Design a protein with these regions (language model features):
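Sequence context of c-type cytochrome heme-c attachment sites
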Residues: 2-98, 105-193, 282, 315-326
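Divalent metal-coordination and catalytic microenvironments
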Residues: 11, 102, 204, 299
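Phosphate-binding glycine-rich loops and adjacent basic patches that engage nucleotide phosphates
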Residues: 1, 65-69, 205, 257-264
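Hydrophobic, helix-length membrane anchors
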Residues: 177-193, 197-231
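Generic detector of short, well-ordered, non-transmembrane alpha-helical segments enriched
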Residues: 7, 98-99, 197-200, 295
Length: 326
């Protein structure tokens, strides 16, 4: 029979419980102290408790219940160690994230785009964001924008407790398909059979049976309006081609990009590289379609000097203060 308490069963099927996952076997230690807070359960506890980075524990440990929740703190909602307030790597302060602050404290780019890109120009070494940029995408930040204001889909504002509302929506009832395989403490949006947890989506997108539904426009200019994911994938492929024209090869392994000898580097080149990596996550279209599309379209234009051909362009704008000199 099914256990009375479902949370442990759900957690056991989550990525947070995968003992042999790369996230929890990645080399950590004194020379990689900044990795500890997210790649070690006890390291996260130390970080949340304000332990100096160089003193945080480096033991290999998955993210168990007591990593996110403090069993001895009844004052914090859900006994979460991090709640409501989180500062993203680019300095963006989120003060109303609720329980999603816990998610955002790790699922972010780990680097600031401006210092990353401009630092790459000075050093000649490519800088890219870390994996899992959901926190930035939900808050329309973290991409390299060349100083433009970017359009946004606004999921971060429209959905209360944004990360948790979608990834932890109730799992389907016992005895039904995908029970304990999506939602809840599985944190999964899709199970192995492709069944999606669209509970939160249905609140606004009535009648849709998938969160990867048809886009409103042809953003990649291929003459066909496809799904949101396909439009983003098309733009990313166009950006790969544009980077190749400028002497950059995209690799499937570290360091992810290779600049040909003799290539003229610039902010435009490094900014486009940053944005290509930033939008790599499969959730980019769902987290913030308009911001993702605008970043990719702008990167293409900055590289080649012209907009994506035949595409519906989401316009980025110069901030009013800069435009007027005020």
């Amino acid at each position: 029979s099914e256990p009375y308490h479902l949370i442990p069963q759900q957690w056991e099927s989550s990525a947070h419980a995968e003992v042999n996952a790369r996230a929890f076997t990645y080399p950590i230690g004194e020379d990689r102290a900044s990795c500890v807070r997210c790649h070690s359960g006890v390291g996260y506890i130390d970080w949340a408790n304000g332990v100096p980075e160089e003193e945080q524990r480096t033991d290999y440990q998955v993210h168990t219940c007591a990593v996110c929740h403090d069993p001895h703190d009844s004052d914090s909602p859900n006994q979460l160690r991090v709640f409501d307030t989180v500062t993203l790597p680019d300095g963006t302060e989120i003060d109303d994230a609720g329980p999603s602050a816990t998610c955002m404290s790790c699922h972010n780019a780990r680097r600031d785009p401006i210092s990353g890109v401009e630092g790459a120009v000075e050093s000649g070494r490519i800088s890219t964001p870390h994996y899992s940029t959901g926190a930035e995408l939900m808050n329309a930040t973290g991409g390299y924008t060349w100083g433009f204001d970017m359009p946004t889909s606004g999921h971060g504002e429209a959905i209360e407790d944004s990360c948790v509302a979608c990834h932890m929506a109730n799992t389907p009832p016992s005895g039904t398909v995908a029970h304990n395989e999506i939602g809840g403490h599985t944190f999964a949006m899709t199970n192995a059979d492709g069944i999606q947890n669209i509970t939160t989506c249905e609140g606004c997108h009535d009648g849709e049976d998938s969160f990867n539904f048809e886009a409103f426009r042809d953003y990649d200019g291929d003459g066909t309006i496809e799904t949101n994911d396909e439009e983003v994938a098309g733009l990313r492929e166009l950006l790969v081609e544009a980077l190749a024209e400028r002497g950059v090869s995209v690799l499937d392994h570290y360091p992810y990009y290779e600049i040909a000898e003799g290539t003229e580097t610039s902010v435009d080149l490094y900014g486009a590289i940053w944005n290509h990596k930033f939008t790599e996550s499969g959730g980019s279209a769902v987290h913030n379609l308009r911001y993702t599309v605008a970043l990719l379209q702008l990167s293409y234009e900055q590289l080649l000097g012209e907009p994506v051909p035949n595409a519906y362009i989401l316009e980025a704008s110069i901030p009013v203060a800069e435009e007027t000199g005020g």
